[in-house]
């Protein structure tokens, strides 16, 4: 072989080595990119699930607030009824005393 042929062979081997290195680097970059895309997709799914959970919790909170308002109204009505019953008991005691006094 001549010197130029040997130089061309070495140059060809060098180019092949560089190409092999570049191909493996590109492959690693593609794998890293794929992992990042999958991670981003998973993050999006998690955000969507979190949003759905928040909506469900908001509905529960609104329902709880409504229930508390209703319970406050019921409590007020029960207090009025208790006061009316107390007045009736007092009047009943007075009537019993008056009846006892009349029957004597």
Curated annotation (Swiss-Prot):
Q: Cellular component per GO?
A: BORC complex; lysosomal membrane
| Localization in the cell | Lysosome membrane
Instruction: Give the UniProt keywords, A-Z.
Output: Lysosome, Membrane
- Kindly give the InterPro entries that the UniProt entry links to this protein: BORCS7
Q: Which PANTHER family match?
A: BLOC-1-RELATED COMPLEX SUBUNIT 7, BLOC-1-RELATED COMPLEX SUBUNIT 7 BORSC7
Q: Quote the function comment for this protein.
A: As part of a BORC-like complex may play a role in lysosomes movement and localization at the cell periphery. Associated with the cytosolic face of lysosomes, this complex may couple lysosomes to microtubule plus-end-directed kinesin motor.
Q: Which family does it belong to?
A: Belongs to the BORCS7 family.
Q: What is this protein called?
A: BLOC-1-related complex subunit 7
Protein species of origin? Xenopus tropicalis
């Amino acid at each position: 072989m001549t010197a130029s042929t040997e130089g061309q062979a070495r140059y060809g081997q060098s180019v092949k080595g560089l190409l092999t290195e570049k191909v493996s680097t590109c492959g690693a970059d593609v794998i890293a990119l794929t992992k990042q895309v999958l991670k981003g997709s998973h993050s999006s799914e998690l955000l969507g699930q979190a949003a759905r959970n928040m909506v469900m919790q908001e509905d529960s909170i609104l329902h709880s607030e409504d229930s508390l308002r209703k319970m406050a109204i019921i409590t007020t009505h029960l207090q009025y009824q208790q006061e009316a019953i107390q007045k009736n008991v007092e009047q009943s005691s007075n009537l019993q005393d008056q009846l006892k006094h009349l029957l004597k």
